[in-house]
Amino acid sequence: MTIIAHGQDQLGHFPLLKESFYGNGSRSFTLLDQALDLAALGFFVFPVTKDKKPLKGCRWKLEASKDFLIVNEMHWANAHGVAIDCLKSGLLVLDADVHDGKQGLKELRRLEALYEEVREAPRVSTPSGGVHIYL
């Protein structure tokens, strides 16, 4: 599983980064900046296309990295987003979808009632109106 951190036009959908690293949002940033910030947090990152797929020729399972030198050499100019290799990064993401008639938010409320960890976990809104919960 991967998490996609979208480019500048969708920073509002990634408030964890916006609040933690970009203050009031006045700082301009690139995908490389975002990738390096995520790598600094210990996440293994790699560039993706507009369709959230690894760039052509990218063997993401092997090449995802948190090493600044390696991340800096990835082909960010051709990318449309930053992805995180969740398995390598030790990250679990709950994806509460609402598109196509899915009831993800209803199920999320049930999980929040049962588990404090889910209630307190960092989260972001997705472009389709759902939520990603980071555990």
Regions found by a protein language model. Give the residues of each.
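Conserved phosphate/metal-binding and DNA-contacting active-site motifs used
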Residues: T2-L135
